[in-house]
């Protein structure tokens, strides 16, 4: 038996190490996981009761249209309910658009490094992948425009970008959209939207009225703290959503996930508190890096990429053996550093202490 040609040699996604895995491997009792950009403060206190209220309905299929959640998200964004596409995490939304638009003979344009699932799903659909290197950690939109031709179907802009945390501002984005041909879909991945504090970050929902080919993706996995439940969504024109709906699997978001996301969306006070604490801790990371001569990309997310000027796997391993899980830049296309999720003050204190010790040992400061 043989799988499809495009799957041969295509590696599966490798998530960061789990807490239990590290405990067993290194005999540690306390682990800090700062590898997957999860919310260290959890989710809204209202989520648990919303989940408990659904436990008697586990034998019943979920609402495949996610009506209650759809209504809340539409009201929150000021869009029509028919402009929304829900997925089992925004990963599935990526998959749906690739399934709907890409095929052999087409191509897709993206930055590198960026969120890897754009490339992964494009390869599965046997489309050509055109990758444009970041410049100073940021999208090179001019170079991306030059890669577009008559066979281009999707351009991906991760904003803010993962793994660098940098962003495309409103002026840059508008200038880019004005030059993208009308036959090309532009997907803006805003997974970290809630964490952004930059004044010139684009508010993209109103742009849907100006650019018919625009898609915005957001998620409940990051700031809302519902990564385990897998709820993401796309926002686009009614006609575009209608066209791609057949590519969506039925019942793709669970009853529990829908209920949890709906109440989490209501608790914007929780989100504001998380964002405020995240920004304060990011500033502490900046000061730490500057005091120790470490390069970093200023971030509009809940993570920071730090360039140590050495093998990222070595930094990753040093921290791992001391109970701190981060992401090696080698796995992300930035081999001389690591990506660290911004944790609580106590977690970050331990990170600073451990990195300081490492730098003294290796005499990198």
Curated annotation (Swiss-Prot):
Pathway per the UniProt entry: Amino-acid biosynthesis; L-histidine biosynthesis; L-histidine from 5-phospho-alpha-D-ribose 1-diphosphate: step 7/9
One GO BP: L-histidine biosynthetic process
Entry-linked Pfam families: Aminotran_1_2
An annotated Gene Ontology molecular function: histidinol-phosphate transaminase activity
UniProt catalytic activity: L-histidinol phosphate + 2-oxoglutarate = 3-(imidazol-4-yl)-2-oxopropyl phosphate + L-glutamate
EC number(s) stated in the UniProt entry for this protein: 2.6.1.9
Assigned keywords, A-Z: Amino-acid biosynthesis, Aminotransferase, Histidine biosynthesis, Pyridoxal phosphate, Transferase
Cofactor or coenzyme needed: pyridoxal 5'-phosphate
Source taxon at top rank: Bacteria
Residues in the signal sequence: none
UniProt keyword Lipid metabolism, yes or no: no
Entry-annotated residues carrying N6-(pyridoxal phosphate)lysine: 222
Family classification: Belongs to the class-II pyridoxal-phosphate-dependent aminotransferase family. Histidinol-phosphate aminotransferase subfamily.
Quaternary structure (record): Homodimer.
Name of the protein: Histidinol-phosphate aminotransferase
